[in-house]
């Protein structure tokens, strides 16, 4: 746990201006059918009021996963703070088979000890399924709550939790000298900060696999350029600034390469840069437009969008050569694919009959499932555990971020109050 906090500390961007969070998750569908669970308000062991409501954060995380439906505190049959105080029968009467209890204890040195227990109320009634405690400073209390959520989620589902991840996105604010901002926040919209401000558009942020850098497109020089920015110190490395278009960056999962699209020779084509040497190799060629690369887990193959068949469709190609293989066949056009972390499926923007929605395609069976019913959906990005997708859609006259589970049952939005939000990118595990 101490190592996890040391790693997270490396992502504090001291040079960036911290903002009041402008996005918050608002659930729109699916929580009622999720598994009920009890997340009891954590007992505050100090004077006055607690600096953070840890239990509320854990409950929100589990609800936001789409897999759990924490009951309201008013419906709880009791509010224990330790496993020994839990009365299993009182919870099973409500259909609840697991309860999270915990405490927050202030320390003399100004830090806090957060402890929790996950209690089984049915199978082995009263037994402790998971427990832990963390000593943290005030600024890391939310992080400790997300850590509780990750551990509880993994214990109950067998899937690694992704509550300590972040999202990057571009905001076009309503005026000012620098109306275009690249921002990063916790996955739930809290702890938002500005990575870069620009008078010209910013596009297509992409995380490095260790979460320390973000590649993106900038037009500050009067034309498009690809850059990589280090979050810890703000250092910017220019990667590509060729004539015409430079866009769609994507780090390879092994962190050694960056794929992107260039139109320096006419049509858009895919290129890959070796990040250590700076050497660039061309992957696709021809007169068609090839763009929007997304890596497969082997760091050797790319899914990408091409109009070589007339309309945009998704193809797969090996970066070392070979004949591209078409992946998508349903719908009038498909684009903007993101390959899942395990390489078993992809999510993409699928257009059919004038509608433009996020869809999921199983790469083994080819089965396609439309996940969304929002308007003009764009740029899907999958969470590192493969359970959720964040994307942008049109709402009114602007654009907002939306969430959907990869089974399509859970939906939520992250409305912004100070501008249009586009190009979301979910971070790796941090």
Swiss-Prot record:
State the GO CC annotations: periplasmic space
Q: Which InterPro entries match?
A: 6-blade_b-propeller_TolB-like (IPR011042), PD40 (IPR011659), Tol-Pal_TolB (IPR014167), TolB_N (IPR007195)
GO BP annotation list: cell division; protein import
- Signal peptide position in this chain? 1-21
Which Gene3D superfamilies does the protein's record reference? TolB, C-terminal domain (2.120.10.30), TolB, N-terminal domain (3.40.50.10070)
Q: Identify one Pfam family in the record.
A: TolB_N
Where is it mostly found? Answer: periplasm
Would the keyword Nucleus be found if you checked this record's keyword annotation?
A: no
According to its UniProt record, where is this protein located? Periplasm
Write out the entry's keywords from A to Z. Cell cycle, Cell division, Periplasm, Signal
- Please give the superkingdom of this protein's source: Bacteria
Question: What is its biological role?
Answer: Part of the Tol-Pal system, which plays a role in outer membrane invagination during cell division and is important for maintaining outer membrane integrity. TolB occupies a key intermediary position in the Tol-Pal system because it communicates directly with both membrane-embedded components, Pal in the outer membrane and TolA in the inner membrane.
Q: Which HAMAP family match?
A: TolB
Q: Per the similarity annotation, which family is this?
A: Belongs to the TolB family.
Q: How does it assemble?
A: The Tol-Pal system is composed of five core proteins: the inner membrane proteins TolA, TolQ and TolR, the periplasmic protein TolB and the outer membrane protein Pal. They form a network linking the inner and outer membranes and the peptidoglycan layer.
Query: What protein does this entry describe?
Result: Tol-Pal system protein TolB
Per the record, the gene is: tolB
């Amino acid at each position: 746990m101490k190592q996890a906090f040391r790693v997270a500390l490396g992502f504090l961007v001291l040079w960036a201006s911290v903002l009041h969070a402008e996005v918050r998750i608002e659930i729109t569908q699916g929580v009622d059918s999720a598994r009920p669970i009890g997340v009891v308000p954590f007992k505050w062991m100090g004077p006055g009021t607690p600096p953070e409501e840890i239990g509320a954060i854990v409950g929100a995380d589990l609800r936001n996963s789409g897999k759990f439906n924490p009951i309201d505190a008013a419906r709880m049959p009791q509010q224990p703070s330790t496993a020994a105080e839990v009365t299993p029968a009182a919870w099973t009467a409500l259909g609840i088979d697991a309860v999270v209890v915990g405490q927050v204890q202030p320390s003399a040195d100004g830090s806090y000890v957060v402890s929790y227990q996950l209690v089984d109320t049915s199978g082995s009634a009263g037994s402790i399924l998971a427990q832990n405690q963390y000593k943290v400073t005030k600024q890391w209390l939310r992080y400790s709550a997300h850590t509780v959520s990750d551990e509880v989620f993994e214990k109950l589902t067998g899937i690694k939790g992704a509550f300590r991840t972040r999202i990057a996105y571009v905001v076009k604010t309503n005026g000012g000298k620098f109306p275009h901002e690249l921002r990063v926040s916790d996955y739930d919209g809290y702890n938002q900060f500005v990575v870069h401000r620009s008078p010209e558009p910013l596009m297509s942020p992409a995380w490095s696999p260790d979460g320390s850098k973000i590649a993106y497109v900038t037009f500050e020089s009067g034309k498009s350029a690809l850059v990589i920015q280090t979050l810890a110190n703000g250092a910017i490395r220019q990667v590509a600034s060729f004539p015409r278009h430079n866009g769609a960056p994507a780090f390879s999962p092994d962190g050694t390469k960056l794929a992107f699209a260039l139109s320096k020779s006419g049509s858009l084509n895919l290129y890959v840069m070796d990040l250590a040497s700076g050497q660039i190799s061309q992957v696709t060629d021809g007169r068609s437009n090839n763009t929007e690369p997304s890596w497969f887990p082997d760091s050797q193959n790319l899914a990408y969008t091409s109009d070589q068949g007339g309309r945009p469709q998704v193809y797969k190609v090996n970066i070392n050569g070979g004949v591209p293989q078409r992946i998508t066949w349903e719908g009038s056009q498909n684009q903007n694919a993101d390959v899942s972390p395990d390489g078993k499926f992809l999510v993409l923007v699928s257009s059919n009959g004038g509608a433009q929605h996020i869809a999921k395609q199983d790469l083994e069976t080819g089965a396609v499932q439309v996940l969304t019913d929002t308007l003009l959906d764009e740029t899907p990005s999958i969470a590192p555990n493969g359970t959720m997708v964040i994307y942008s859609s049109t709402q009114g006259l602007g654009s907002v971020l939306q969430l959907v589970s990869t089974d399509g049952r859970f939906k939520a939005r992250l409305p912004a109050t100070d501008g249009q939000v586009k190009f979301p990118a979910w971070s790796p595990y941090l």
